[in-house]
Amino acid sequence: MLTDNRTWVIVLAGGIGSRFWPVSTLERPKQLLPLVDDGPLRTDTIDRARSLVPDERIRVLAGEHLVEPFRSSLPNFPADSYLCEPLARGTAPALAWAAWHIAQIDPDAVMVSLHADHIIRPREAFQETVNAAVDVVLRHDLLVCIGTVPDRIEVGYGHVEPGERLDASGGLKAYRVRAFHEKPDRETAHRYVEAGHLWNTGIFAWKARTLLEEIEQHAPEIHRHIPLLEENAEAFFKVVPTSVIDRAVVEQSERFAVLGATFTWDDVGSWEALARLHLSDAQGNVIVGAGQTVESSDNVVFTDQGSVVLFGIENLVVIRTGDRTLVLPRERAADLKELLEQLDSEA
């Protein structure tokens, strides 16, 4: 458990996981799927949250269609721990609602925001890092982003440029944020890694009051609708614009710190993640499900129905689920969101 007994944990459990299409869909997004271990990602995340705070200080933010799958897999989790989003409006309105909700109870309470679809190991290092992040929040009244040291060049992640060193507990390294850099090109990402920038994990800690203040300053188009929450969540979500917290607040705020994590982290962001999270064969093929390769190398295969056989194939992602089969080059795995937008426009 965390040292501070006023901290809350918010689990962001919405999102479609479009880069895991066709397995991940609106009705069955990736956080409900056993993509890495035998159990779904959501179960691991709730266990992680429970290692920090008691159940009564955990809130799960999810669309109404996802609450029942959570409840069925977590029968002992309190029913009032779910904040059901009436409409999908992105992480900024969702976290504004969560901050308002917690501020009604304790305005100076610290919120730790987690995603339901990340892989984090080991648990002890995660607890140590979050405890230090909460300590930075309480010492400096800053908003804290948890960052990790890059182990490769990655254009799909936000990068954090550290500045002035700050005190942090447990010997961890914390810094004022000099700048956030969103999803650079490959050459720029390489420069960031060489310069000691960190990846933005999307795990944040901040006081409920402080987040609401920053939303008021940097996202007034969201803040002006917060009084509607006195009525109900539906009134708020009907009128609030869609926005993500990174663009609405994180990249604009001058009150951010970054804390270097001691855990390993993966956002399981695309099919390419399976190559990092599963063992490959001698030819570099990663196979999840029933698959076989002959004279093939460096492929990623996932099937939850039937089997897949590859012959003389290299560097492909091959996905089979239900009545759909997807085949694409591995280097295009991160582009699936754009493919879905094109398919939707042509439908």
Question: What are the residue ranges of the model-derived segments?
Answer:
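Solvent-exposed alpha-helices and their adjacent loops that cap or buttress functional pockets
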Residues: M1-N5, L12, S51-V53, Q104-D106, ...
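Left-handed beta-helix
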Residues: M1-R6, W206-A347
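Conserved N-terminal catalytic core of the sugar/cofactor nucleotidyltransferase
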Residues: M1-V11, R19-P29, P34-N131, T148, ...
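Fold-independent oxyanion-binding glycine-rich loops
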Residues: G14, G63-E64, P86, L114-A116, ...
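Conserved beta-strand scaffold positions in the cores of enzyme catalytic domains, especially
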Residues: L32, Y82, L143-C145, R255-V258
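Residue-level signal for inorganic ion chemistry
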Residues: R42, A98, D117, V160, ...
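A short acidic, often aromatic-flanked loop/helix-cap motif at beta-alpha or helix-coil junctions
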Residues: A88-P93, R152-E154, R186-E187, W265-D267
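Conserved core of the sugar-phosphate nucleotidyltransferase
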Residues: P122-R224, E230-V240, A257, G306, ...
